[in-house]
Amino acid sequence: KGGIVRDPVSNPPARILLDNPRKNAGRLSVNETDADVAVATAEVRVRFDRSTGLMTVTDLRNGKEVIKEVKGVDFQKNRTTVTLRNAVGEFFYGGGVQNGRFSHRGKRIEIVNTNSWTDGGVASPAPFYWSTGGYAAMPYTFAPGAYDFGSTDKNTVTISHEMPYLDLFLMVDTTPVDLLRDYYQLTGNPVLLPKFAFYEGHLNAYNRDYWKETTEEGKGILFEDGKRYVESQKDNGGIKESLNGEKQNYQFSARAVIDRYKKDDMPLGWILPNDGYGAGYGQTTTLDGNIANLKSLGDYARKNGVEIGLWTQSNLHPVDSIPALLQRDIVKEVRDAGVRVLKTDVAWVGAGYSFGLNGIADVANIMPYYGSDARPFIITLDGWAGTQRYGGVWSGDQ
């Protein structure tokens, strides 16, 4: 049965593992000789050499030695490093969303929350990798790390995290699918997004900018009234946009966007009308007034087969010290306005590690509870192992 698995340090608290990640491994056998000590199930044997303390792991289903430790664990005050064999023809994948990188043989990857969305950045790290040699590894930690798959020594793999102890899950299976299933057994299956999420989404800000008519050649955007307009985040003397077009500004509204998709027979699944800094979703003097404005858009959108969502620049729950424009109340947004999509921002999850996991776990529970059992649709980044059970990960703003 095993004992209690010690959770890694996390602040704020978050859970990498599911509540019940164990499965019955069958009968365990322990074999001791003068040379080594081995623990085995019917499928896997873990052996420790008495003279060196080094570990080898064998897949008994095919007799293959899949993991071989080539150097003792290096314990430093603020870092622990494991060194394994890097076999000829062995390839490595994982580490989360490593922008522009997916096959890591001969390379070093950072398991670090970099808040970088371009080539080589780490949009959402995960302390996990799998090998074509028949194994996978997941350090059980929220600490930053680095995995070197032969960039300095082509014959070794090093797993290093900023922690003074070693806590590591090893998984043994022959196919990538089975290794991923092992990982999901520990951390949870990827969330199944709602049906509307598989249709096109439209993300923009429709509660902030001003549109001023221009006759200058080659400038502006052509609208339905036959005129061209220049957009500005500052008041340029033009018409200010809104969600519902209630201020004689329909063609600059979020409702107009929904109508354009319908007019052009383009299936639209969801819309985020506040995807821009300082946008908000209403122009009244109170949070409740703005939520009523959001609900009005939601009712119109749902009548046209579209769900609404929000980009989350601000805190999810009310903070009295900030203006009504940027106030948030996630419960009322979901329960009253009918919000069914949330896209995170660095202001919410940007600290990463346990912070990123903690924040979306909260919303993943709020959405079905206050949203009539709605399936959560969270678009996120800056995650960790376990993020996949709550939301879909994107690569960030390029």
Describe the role of every protein-language-model region.
Residues 1-203, 214, 235-245, 249-254, ...:
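N-terminal accessory segment at the very beginning of proteins
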Residues 119, 260-262, 333, 338:
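A general structural signal for stabilizing positions within well-ordered secondary structure
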Residues 147-156, 207, 214-238, 291-307, ...:
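Short, charge-rich amphipathic segments
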Residues 198-245, 258-260, 264, 271-288, ...:
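Aromatic-lined carbohydrate-binding surfaces of glycoside hydrolases
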